[in-house]
From Swiss-Prot:
Family, per entry: Belongs to the universal ribosomal protein uS3 family.
PANTHER family named among the record's database cross-references: 30S/40S RIBOSOMAL PROTEIN S3, SMALL RIBOSOMAL SUBUNIT PROTEIN US3C
Gene: rpsC
Record protein name field: Small ribosomal subunit protein uS3
Residue ranges of every copy of the KH type-2 domain listed in the record: 38-106
Function text: Binds the lower part of the 30S subunit head. Binds mRNA in the 70S ribosome, positioning it for translation.
Short name of any one Pfam family annotated for the protein: KH_2
Length: 224
């Protein structure tokens, strides 16, 4: 099961949380569609800002959006001008009050979405796919990853027949739920066609915290 299912969804409720946090008794379809529109708008608007994740949280007529990016300065702009303009555009798009929170990604080489996007852009720039995969795995391991697997599929180097190639370093235990596996799939659009880039990064294990139980009091009357 762990080899086939999306690793992010497989760990929801265990070591991962949902990227959309809201409840809709009515109008679920419209709310979900609005979430997709918000994410699409942000990804297109900030396509050069290394945005990895967009979290959406709703409360009454208010939307709280957390943008995880490796380039917070580009998103915020001088004096907060860029993020304020983005907030006004999202207000107009949704018709609701929008609050934006910028979260900086400290180690972009351990973020599967950013790594996959970097490889895809190199493929579009006609960089050799093996070189792009090897450099990505080396940077991830130097950044502290326990393991990484990169797979590219399509007409690699313009070959007549599509195929798959992968590069792996370290351990990537997909069936271990406590293993923090980050996964992403990005498409590269080249002159030879579309090439899929998949990245799995093992960032270590997340162990559940246990609360210490208070010591039991001895029974009255002493030991028997």
């Amino acid at each position: 099961m762990g080899q086939k299912i999306n690793p992010n969804g497989f760990r929801l409720g265990v070591i991962r949380d949902w990227e959309s946090k809201w409840y809709a008794d009515k109008g679920y379809k419209e709310t979900l569609k609005e979430d997709l529109q918000i994410r699409k708008f942000i990804s297109e608007k900030l396509k050069d800002a290394s945005v990895s994740t967009v979290e959406i949280e709703r409360a009454a007529n208010r939307i709280n959006i957390s943008i995880h990016t490796a380039k917070p300065g580009m998103v915020i702009g001088k004096g907060g001008s860029e993020v304020e303009a983005l907030r006004k555009q999202l207000n107009a798009l949704t018709g609701k009050q929008v609050h934006i929170n910028i979260v900086e990604i400290k180690k972009p080489d351990l973020d599967a979405e950013l790594v996959a996007d970097s490889i895809a852009r190199q493929l579009e720039a006609r960089i050799a796919f093996r070189r792009a995969m090897r450099q990505a795995t080396q940077r991830a391991m130097l950044a502290g990853a326990k393991g990484i697997k990169v797979q590219t599929s399509g007409r690699l180097n313009g070959a007549d027949m599509a195929r798959r190639e992968w590069h792996t370093e370290g351990r990537v235990p997909l069936q271990t739920l406590r293993a923090d596996i980050d996964y992403a799939w990005v498409n590269a659009f080249t002159t030879y066609g579309e090439i899929g880039v998949q990245v799995w990064i093992n960032r270590g294990e997340i162990l559940p915290t246990r609360k210490n139980k208070p010591a039991s009091k001895p029974a009255k009357g002493g030991n028997r």
